[in-house]
Amino acid sequence: MRNEMHLQFSARSENESFARVTVAAFVAQLDPTTDELTEIKTVVSEAVTNAIIHGYNNDPNGIVSISVIIEDGVVHLTVRDEGVGIPDIEEARQPLFTTKPELERSGMGFTIMENFMDEVIVESEVNKGTTVYLKKAYCEKQTLCN
């Protein structure tokens, strides 16, 4: 069974919590544990915050797009911006790396995503934007997947 949702919103920090809760509510149909829901909310928060702060430099005119596809107990989550892009993806994925040290950002966003998800793919082009693909299987303990 396949189910999907798509969401677009202005790149405003106050929309991060809306995105987090919306995705968690959609994923709840898989009956994840409380810890698993917390993890998906954290991942959405990190990806959306990266888009707003780094992709759009806090320009509220930018648009963040989220797609979630659930198929056979697997969540496919995509977070996309059309911001400044990432010049060096490998460097950006290093723990503690940040382009905004003045904001006291921890530089752990991608590391957190990698720890909570089964797969994280980052595609980016300078001055065109960034897309983060995330995948998590909830099948192993779900009767829905049998």
UniProtKB/Swiss-Prot annotation:
Keywords: ATP-binding, Kinase, Nucleotide-binding, Serine/threonine-protein kinase, Sporulation, Transferase. This is Anti-sigma F factor. Binds to sigma F and blocks its ability to form an RNA polymerase holoenzyme (E-sigma F). Phosphorylates SpoIIAA on a serine residue. This phosphorylation may enable SpoIIAA to act as an anti-anti-sigma factor that counteracts SpoIIAB and thus releases sigma F from inhibition. One of its GO terms (molecular function) is sigma factor antagonist activity. It holds the Pfam family HATPase_c_2. Belongs to the anti-sigma-factor family. It catalyses: L-seryl-[protein] + ATP = O-phospho-L-seryl-[protein] + ADP + H(+); L-threonyl-[protein] + ATP = O-phospho-L-threonyl-[protein] + ADP + H(+). The keyword Metal-binding does not apply. Signal peptide: none annotated. HAMAP family: Anti_sigma_F (MF_00637). One of its GO terms (biological process) is sporulation resulting in formation of a cellular spore. InterPro entries: Anti-sigma-factor_SerPK, Anti-sigma_F, HATPase_C_sf. Its EC number is 2.7.11.1. SUPFAM superfamilies: ATPase domain of HSP90 chaperone/DNA topoisomerase II/histidine kinase.
